[in-house]
Structures are given as structure tokens and as C-alpha cells.
Amino acid sequence: LKRCKESVWKYKGMWEDFSATVGFWADMEHPYVTYDNNFIESEWWALKQIWEKGLLYKGFKIVPYCPRCGTPLSSHEVAQGYKDVKERSAIAKFKAKGEDAYILAWTTTPWTLPSNVALCVNANEDYVKVESKGDTYYLAQALCDTVLGEGEYTVLETYKGADLEGKEYEPLYQFVSPKEKCWYVVCDDYVTLTDGTGVVHIAPAFGEDDAKVGRKYGLPLVQLVDGKGQMTPETKWPGGFCKDADKEILKDLDERGLLFSAPKFEHSYPFCWRCDTPLIYYARESWYIKMTDVKGELIQNNNTVNWLPESIGKGRFGDWLENVQDWAVSRNRYWGTPLNIWECECGHRHAIGSI
């Protein structure tokens, strides 16, 4: 804590120098210091007002999470650390139950494959069963040329995505045995035919879209990565950082004949602005402010602000408000303002508004 307090005053001086350089006016003689009780009390007061309006809640949601810092990040923090990276994606072969055929599913996060519980297709798109080079596959019709090669396949049957709903397959890994039904095809319109195979692998513990589909179908939450971002003891790669496990998982699938291909994929990926660790989208229990409930008011108020230049208010900031998400305000660390919610064993919660 002593080191943390020292850093406050170190950065106070740097902030004053920076503010003077850019011509920003502020009351430098009376700065707010986050560890000061007066500041903590002001935060508690504000949080209690939010609590009394029913806008503060505890939820189990997918959050951008830094495994090195051990804490979720807000959308503002995530926006500070994006980098363009090239990584190996995976087109995995999921064997259809009861037939000698495979469902081809694409993912940019191979480390989530051990936690797979379903495959998702778009109910309204066209899918095919094809024969290619001695093997039989299911995938989106529009992506056959891209995935298999033009003229390198024969269409055996044609379906709508909805026709495949409920089709069961054999899991790539079975490190756990969930009680809930899993390992079957589900449908959702978030699946597009822009990339991949038109079939998306679902791991509800590691993605907002996955979690939404999981809630829709009552899928189990299989979380084979711990709070440090390490693969859990149930897997073949215990203790290794999850993103570093990509290579081992791809190698393992290839050796077992369950990897169709592992194309390189360039995309923008978030890194922790504090420590430069790759973030993961991770199911965590956190406290949230229901920004989505006041979205309309935020947009209305923003329209009354005289922005200069106007494009910032209507564009960058306005676009952010249009897509605002519930704000994860709690952090899993010792340093910071204590959350003002007291919870007893019976589940009763009380919000403190002052010291």
C-alpha cells in the first residue's frame, strides 16, 4: 500500500506538467486523491444513489479480464489497448454422431475448444453436406469454395440451418461431464458467412455471444481456464497460459485427425493497458451499473451538449453511447475504493452512503 500511495503523488506531478503543456485548466491546489477518505465517501454517496435507483447489481457476465492483474476492465480501459495481431485460427472437425461425417467449425480462439459445449449455425442460411477428398463435411454452402477449394467437392445434401438444429456430435475433448445437455447444434442469427465455415463453436464461459446462446439453450458453463488465465488441472495442459496453449491444442487435434486447417488470421485484439497482457473474455461475478437502462437519457443529454468539433459528440462519443454496455465497476484487487455493499450470509444486501 505504501508503494501505491507513492505512485499517486508521482503521477500527480506528471499530470500537472502534462495539463500545463496542453493548456488544460484544473484546480491543481486541491486535487482529489482516490485513497483519501473524503473521496471514498463521495464515491460511496454516488454509488448509494445508484443503488437506490435499482441500477447497481451483482451479475455473472462475460467481461474483458486481465489474467495478470486478476481483474475485469471497463470498456474505457479496453479501448486503450487494442493491437493488430496475427494468430492461428482453427477449423476443427467435430464428428457427427451416428455417421461418418464431420461438422467443420471455425474459431479464432483454439484455447477455448476444450470448453466447447455446442456448435451454432444461422437458421436462415443454406448449409450443405459435401464429399471432399474422401471425407464428408457439413458447412455453409456459400463458404464451400473458400474452405474446400473451387471444384474440390461434391454436394450430397442441402439444408437450412434450422434443419440442423439438435444434431448431435462427439466432443473434441471430454475433460468434464456436464449434467446439462450439450454437444449438439444450436441456432442464432449472430452467425454470419463473412469468414470461417458458417458454423461457430460455442463456449459460454468465454464470449458474450456464446453466453447469450448458452442462456437461450440452457447450456452448461464449462470453464477450463482459471483466474490466472492458466489451463486447469482437468486438461492435458495444466498451468500453461491459455493463449500459449493454442499451439499445443492445434498439434493435439492434428495428431488425432480432428484439425481440418489452422489458417493465420489477422485481427484487432485487446491488451491490458497496465501490463500489456492479452485480455481474455471471461465469465466473472462482478458488480455492474445498468447503463443500458439509462441509455436513452444519456443519448438525449448528449444531444444538448455543444460539442466542438461537432463530429466528436455525434460521432465517436455518440456512437459509444449508442452501443453502451452495463459498466463493470468492481475490481478484484486490494488497492482501490472499497465497494460500499455489505452482504450477510442470508443474502441481504445493504448500501453504505457515508463513512
Question: What is the meaning of each model-derived region?
Answer:
Residues 115-121, 125-227, 254, 294:
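Catalytic alpha/beta core of large soluble enzyme barrels
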Residues 1-114, 166, 190, 194-353:
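Residue patterns forming the tRNA-binding/recognition surfaces of aminoacyl-tRNA synthetases
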